[in-house]
């Protein structure tokens, strides 16, 4: 199996020479159909992609397309509720589109040789997973981690956003299976081997409800997560102890300047290992929380964190409630929807998409697991105008969860932060479980 060269900017594929990007490679098609047709188009695209403002202008036609489609069809999808169009919604759509365009820098684009290598990794993973029976029985892919005890954790104090907190650090202990594609690359991320979580708890030893709040992509720091996950509401208004774990390669575990950058890249096996490790680390964290006399344990995640929370809701039988906010539920589908046309076409040509990726990601898809959380304690919220985690992603999770309570707000991906509707929904959802379980503990 070919190994990727790691480079300082976090692109594990290596290489910035433009000739490499354009030249044919021995392990891929010498001159493909895409090469012949798309050459002039790619030259113009590369010129524009190097300029941040030029990339940001893509938001204008994309926003107009969204508004026009919604006006013509009266809906954002065949089975999705009709959006309530407004200037505010259009502005949030434009914000999402601009952020997406700005994120698509040239160094995030794969080299020509990367397609064959990534395709080979996925094909090898698919073959291995089929032999082991993991694709048909995804539960069996996830090993039960050892419990976490206080003696395993080092604690330090910190301060962010006007609030003190404890920081827990421990050895993750996670490693991919031997000979699993991408395992060596993943284990080379040394800072990722230490798991970490921010803990905000009430003084005293009284039993309390706990919530594990899981951040999204590019987050993982207290000053971001406290606001992004509404820690103050959960802690002060609902009286919960709040734990905010850092996902693999995020926050203190990052290996590049951008938090989480290698997690969501063209190295698709990174996402498989990252999600598997996230589940492993949080399951260990849950064992420690249970030792604290928790009256209930809830999961709340946004975006990428909602994806992880949704997997955990189908694996761990001791979760009392789960809230999936602006969730992702289909990684290969998300990759295709956000990839430029050229990359998408080449990925299909090299048989990365359209079979292998979809099969491999079954082992880390929330749609592969039947939720163990009670139906009336499953909650979803999503935005009509979300361009980062499209509404169809939330719709699929909601349907897979047998259509529990869902709240659709008129906004984009980050619009939930200033949506009173979302805040009220979150407080009502987690407030219910914390009140019920706390009352039951007192009566007992």
Task: Write out the residue ranges for each language-model feature.
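N-terminal targeting or regulatory segments adjacent to alpha/beta-hydrolase or S9 domains
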Residues: 2-182, 443-444
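Alpha/beta-hydrolase fold nucleophile elbow
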Residues: 293-302
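Cap/lid segment of the alpha/beta-hydrolase catalytic domain
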Residues: 213-276
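Gly/Ala-rich beta-loop-alpha elbow adjacent to hydrolase catalytic centers
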Residues: 301-305, 309
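Conserved alpha/beta-hydrolase "acid-adjacent" motif
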Residues: 387-393
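Short beta-strand/loop motif that positions the catalytic acidic residue
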Residues: 373, 380-382
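Hydrolase active-site cap/lid region
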Residues: 310-356, 408
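Catalytic histidine-centered segment of alpha/beta-hydrolase-like enzymes
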Residues: 412-423
